[in-house]
Amino acid sequence: MDSRTGELITAHQAENGVYIWELENPLYFKIHRVEDPLYTRTRVYHVQIRFNHNLRKALHLHKAYLNFQVWTTSMTASGSIYLARFRYLVNMYLDQLGVISINNVVRAVRFATNRVYVNHVLENHSIKFKFY
């Protein structure tokens, strides 16, 4: 859903993509917080993927932040180690695919989190399209 207007994103907007070799560093990965809930054997990573300026320009986006909460049973991986592994798997999937779009990035995250140690993935995105 477009967070500015509240309108649903169309299939054409979600599948509109750019070849990966046309852009340098198209995605920024950030880890906001790592939570260790008390009395559990889980760790929660709050990961944000941002589209860089050239990718947003090519896809006619004003803002694109994809936020994920990854609930894992992995207690040994720190935030930076998990982020490096997560970034590698997402980029590997997109490199094999060759096209970056909103849906392809979500599919890449699904690929990266389809592991034994991942319990749940919660998504909360902030996407705004250009009107002009």
From Swiss-Prot:
Belongs to the geminiviridae replication enhancer protein family. Keywords: Host-virus interaction. GO terms for biological process: viral process. The keyword Cytoplasm does not apply. This is Replication enhancer protein. Homooligomer. Interacts with the replication-associated protein (REP). Interacts with host proliferating cell nuclear antigen (PCNA). Interacts with host retinoblastoma-related protein 1 (RBR1), and may thereby deregulate the host cell cycle. Oligomerization and interaction with PCNA are necessary for optimal replication enhancement. The keyword Transit peptide does not apply. Disulfide bonds: none annotated. It comes from the Viruses. InterPro entries: Gemini_AL3 (IPR000657). Increases viral DNA accumulation. Enhances infectivity and symptom expression.
